């Protein structure tokens, strides 16, 4: 009987704990859930909004593309001790095409190294999941991975940044707002947005949302045209170029040049 | 104003490609070169990937060379017969060159040799052209536009001229053997394919010094050749890599078609040796840039596969 009571109490406690945990989780909101790429698109702003006690807490937002990439690069090495050349192929498998981490304070001040590693929140920990080949040894793998990060960062596809946050109101009615720049380099697709709520170097809650980036209108039409009707698209591109060239020629002729 | 490029998958200030197109278009109209050596790195600086930059540049060159070719045709500077013969040669050379690259790569370290040979060759062409044009300018040979040449060159030129299948290129006003024209086109096409370049820098000196075509006709005829080469490249890039961005290309050729017209009218006001010395200077600048690219330590030690 005692054991039964204990089990019931434990179940209620766990359920209660789960609901408290979910209190934040359910109230996090990501706006917009769909980012539309039109002709004048130049990136967007992503807002993370939450309700609850946010004072004195820290937040980490990890955005990564759901699509894992298989990328082939060329190594740049000094050949014959003379010139820098693109040499052999280098394959990166199982890497997210897009990987951004935002935090309200520097990561190492918010979480322990173990937690950062367990949750894949640094570029170094991400490396463990990546299949990189061919490499001679671990040193070369580390070096090439750093170069990969540099390349991705150059095109704003990988980034780490400390962002400010707004926590307004009192007690449980506080409103949290974090604004994140969404780079225009992020291609269409689905993105997983993971929000970590942290207090005293402990993760209190993790929430996941999906943001979809989609092409619309003329941008979508032209992409589909280029992909699905490549030959007609190529001929069309040539015709437009030829017409433009001759048209400008005619205009200049009329202009008396 | 920013616009989104559907194939390049990036947003760009539309003013930038327009200005880049305008600048490269002037060079194209002036010298009859495609300008890929300048445009592709410029596009990469704007955040366009190397594959899309190279493919879209080819599409842009179609418009610029059509515009420039039309402008030169109006003033009687395009020798279509000569252009077609050189095209036959360079297309065949291109096909052989692509196969040859595969063989060379299989032998190992071919890329290094190819790169070094290209730099040396450009350097020699640029220097010789510069010296010759400078001495021509000094001597003020302005009465007749003729490409001066040394005794050795004259002997070689005579040999080329004496080959069978003689034909008269009326616009260029030169008698040449059809075999030598097609053969030289083939060599340029072969070298261009091996070195992965458009070939304008090689075709212009070949026409000036070996076929003895007047500089103004060289520019017009070279544009005619570049036009057809880039039509082929644009269609191939569309089909094989899906890498031609039509919006970016339109922005580029809005500038380059106008630039090519201006380049052609500036060129008409310059003498042959003046044009040659400016082109020689540009070839030398490109050579120096290539040497720096090859010798300076890069900022990132990996690069995406594809592109130039």
Task: Label the predicted regions.
Chain A
Residues 181, 202-235:
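Short, aromatic-rich amphipathic segments at membrane interfaces
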Residues 20-25:
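Sec/Tat signal peptide C-region and signal peptidase I cleavage site
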Residues 189-195:
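A short tyrosine-centered beta-strand micro-motif
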Residues 26-42:
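N-terminal edge beta-strand
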Residues 1-10:
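Bacterial N-terminal signal peptides that target proteins for export
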Residues 241-257:
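Juxtamembrane interface at the cytosolic side of transmembrane helices
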């Amino acid at each position: 009987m005692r054991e039964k009571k204990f089990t019931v109490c434990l179940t209620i406690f766990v359920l209660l704990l789960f609901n408290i945990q979910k209190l934040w989780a359910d109230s996090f909101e990501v706006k917009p859930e769909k980012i539309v790429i039109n002709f004048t698109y130049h990136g967007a702003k992503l807002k993370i909004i939450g309700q609850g006690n946010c004072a004195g807490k820290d937040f980490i937002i990890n955005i990564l593309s759901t699509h894992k990439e298989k990328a082939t690069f060329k190594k740049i090495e000094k050949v014959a001790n003379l010139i820098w050349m693109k040499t052999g192929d280098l394959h990166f498998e199982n890497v997210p095409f897009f990987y951004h981490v935002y935090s309200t304070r520097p990561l190492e001040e918010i979480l322990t190294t173990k937690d950062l590693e367990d949750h894949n929140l640094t570029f170094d920990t991400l490396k463990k999941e990546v299949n990189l080949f061919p490499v001679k040894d671990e040193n070369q793998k580390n070096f090439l991975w750093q170069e990969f990060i540099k390349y991705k960062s150059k095109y704003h596809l990988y980034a780490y940044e400390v962002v400010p946050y707004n926590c307004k109101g009192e007690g449980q009615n506080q409103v949290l707002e974090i604004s994140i720049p969404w780079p225009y380099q992020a291609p269409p697709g689905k993105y997983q947005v993971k929000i970590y709520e942290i207090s005293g170097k402990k993760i209190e809650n993790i929430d996941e949302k999906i943001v979809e980036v989609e092409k619309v209108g003329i941008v979508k039409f032209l992409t589909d045209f280029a992909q699905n009707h490549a030959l007609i698209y190529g001929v069309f591109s040539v015709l437009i170029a030829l017409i433009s060239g001759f048209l400008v020629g005619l205009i200049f002729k009329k202009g008396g040049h | 104003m920013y616009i989104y490029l559907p194939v390049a998958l990036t947003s760009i200030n539309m003013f930038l490609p327009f200005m880049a197109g305008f600048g490269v278009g002037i060079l194209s109209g002036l010298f009859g070169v495609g300008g890929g050596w300048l445009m592709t790195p410029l596009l990469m600086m704007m955040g366009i990937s190397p594959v899309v930059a190279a493919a879209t540049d080819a599409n842009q060159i179609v418009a610029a060379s059509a515009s420039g070719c039309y402008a030169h045709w109006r003033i009687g500077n395009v020798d279509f017969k000569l252009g077609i013969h050189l095209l036959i040669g360079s297309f065949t050379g291109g096909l052989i060159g692509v196969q040859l690259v595969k063989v060379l790569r299989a032998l190992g370290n071919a890329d290094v040799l190819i790169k070094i040979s290209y730099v040396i060759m450009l350097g020699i062409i640029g220097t010789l052209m510069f010296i010759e044009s400078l001495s021509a300018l000094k001597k003020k040979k302005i009465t007749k536009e003729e490409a001066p040449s040394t005794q050795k060159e004259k002997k070689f030129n005579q040999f080329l001229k004496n080959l069978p299948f003689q034909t008269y290129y009326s616009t260029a006003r030169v008698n040449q053997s059809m075999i030598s024209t097609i053969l030289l086109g083939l060599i340029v096409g072969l070298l261009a394919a091996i070195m992965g370049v458009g070939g304008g820098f090689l075709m212009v000196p070949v026409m000036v010094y070996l076929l003895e075509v007047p500089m103004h006709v060289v520019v017009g005829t070279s544009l005619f050749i570049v036009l057809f080469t880039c039509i082929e490249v644009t269609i191939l890039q569309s089909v094989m890599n899906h890498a031609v961005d039509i919006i970016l290309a339109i922005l580029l050729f809005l500038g380059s078609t106008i630039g090519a017209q201006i380049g052609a009218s500036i060129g008409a006001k310059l003498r042959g040796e003046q044009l040659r010395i400016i082109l020689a200077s540009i070839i030398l600048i490109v050579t120096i840039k290539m040497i720096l690219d090859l010798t300076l330590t890069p900022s990132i030690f990996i690069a995406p596969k594809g592109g130039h």
